[in-house]
């Protein structure tokens, strides 16, 4: 199921379900996917089930929403300082020459590795544990808070100090930490990330 956050023709924020043909049906009583996720947790049901029950006949199209730049990011916290953009090197194994040089050195004696490379190796070796086993916390990176996330079609501004600025397509996992500190997966989205592999 594909869901989006968008601005309706009347200017109001909406959540919509996108069909295979690009038709967007508005979800009744939902203005953000964050609200939907919280409600589904409280009701102990899947977001999909809630959407199926509340999909309306009010329609829009993806083509029009994109052409008129009415699309929002798929998920956001109402307080951007409570939203974290981060990742792990384990999902970027071949994204940069720096990773390739790390792989070449992994066969060395662990005592000769830098702390960063040790963490990378620990993550490779034990970062994806079997069910009910505790794994190694993988190497990870922090990109910023919710203020760093831009809506689709929004301008990406490159810093003046960039050495090799560029964009990378990313597959993003969207997670929410609930009131009991349980991590809940909301879904996945495509993203366009600014990166600088030289700096």
Residue spans for each PLM region:
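Active-site microenvironments in enzyme catalytic cores
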Residues: 4-6, 38, 42-199
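Gly/serine-rich nucleotide phosphate-binding loop at the start of the catalytic core
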Residues: 2-51
